[in-house]
Amino acid sequence: MLTDALAPRATIPQRLDRLPLTWTLWRLGLVTQAGWAVVVATDAIAARIYPFVWGPRHAFDTAAFSILLLVSTGVGIVAGEYFFAVLSDRFGRRTTLLAAAATCGLGTLPAGFVDDFWLLTLSLGIGAMGIGGVLATCTVYLAEVAPSQARGRMTQTSQAFAIFLLAVLTSLPGILLMPEHYQAYVVLMAAGPLLVLVPLVAFVLPESPRWLDVHGRHEQAEAVVSMLERDCETRAGPLPAPITGDVAPQSQATVRDLFGPEYRRRTVLLFACWLLGYSGLVYGVIGFLNLYLARVGFSARAVFISGLISGVVGGAAGLLAAARLNERVERRAVILAGALVACLGLVLVFLTGEVWHSLPALSIAAVILNAGAYLWLFNMYTYTAVAYPTRIRSVGTGWTDGFGHVGSIVSPLIVGALFTATAHVGYIGFFGYVIIPGALLPALLIARFGIKQKAAPLETVAGA
């Protein structure tokens, strides 16, 4: 058999990189990205409820809402990413996903039954820790099982599925339940990690063979890779010979390597870009766009309808188009293109609120915004995971993406202040911040100073 003949001469990464894209690998990608979707559905849930429930009830004011966002989209996620990243590199990707998913669901659930500011902050803060853990681990797992020549196609197609699922999970129940039955809405969001992700991870995902290999569990890594090879051969026929001899063995690596001579530059660059992007294009928009739309007169139903359309059409279509490019276009260029498209969408949202004020116009603007924002976000996820070697990949992703979530901590303070200060002139402070330092600047930095990743073996890129 081809697998047995090649096993003594090929490393685990080389054998993974020659696997064809069959249902064997698609299944792993779809499960990890379904995990991303069900936990992100709980992320910033306060921003979907406050404009239509807690705000009109005067449960707490806009300043307290900003603090709630600071904890539930910032502090909690940062703490979770760092904590679960360490667990992931020590105990494995699969075990960490199970623990983080349970934390997310159990933490979010009480938010459907209280409107006290402090109890909400505690509940959503704990849930956010689980979100951070899943974010830090899902991307790493997907990067480690995706073959290098098809990494872009596999990751971005799986991510397009995740965006479609996220749009349906957050918007369709919102159309049917918000604001009258918001408690049921929260319960549905919390049920996703507990009743969907936990069983999928427990019964479908094997442990990452790359993680097993670098942690000395060679027999387990061999068993997982052999199983994947057998399944792929059954579906696609004999496997091609792996490319050997071009990848140098990885040396022992620690967290200190993130700041050592080899990785310091890329770590600092990712710190800066995630910090700016999370403060603006991601959590600046997530935290305050719904509030802006409510202030200019859009109903909850209109906001959730536009969210469903933009998520299904915009986000998924953008990533599917990028997946067709596979690894033929440098990832840095795709990140920049995503930021430019998102900025165009934000300008159109502003014009919709100030001039056109119609659901069709809002939906078109939101489609363009989501297409660009998700293109930027998911390519940044993949770029970050691929930038580090396997032994520190989870910690590297967790540290850089986690530090970037400091942007989600400062975002409610900066964006919230600009939002309030420029309310009389169309909230242009909000739009100006999320467009310039929050989207364009980080994309330009990656395009100018980032490393090349196009179609390169994972170990070669990480060690470059």
Predicted regions span which residues?
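Transmembrane-helix signature of 12-pass secondary carriers
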Residues: 1-464
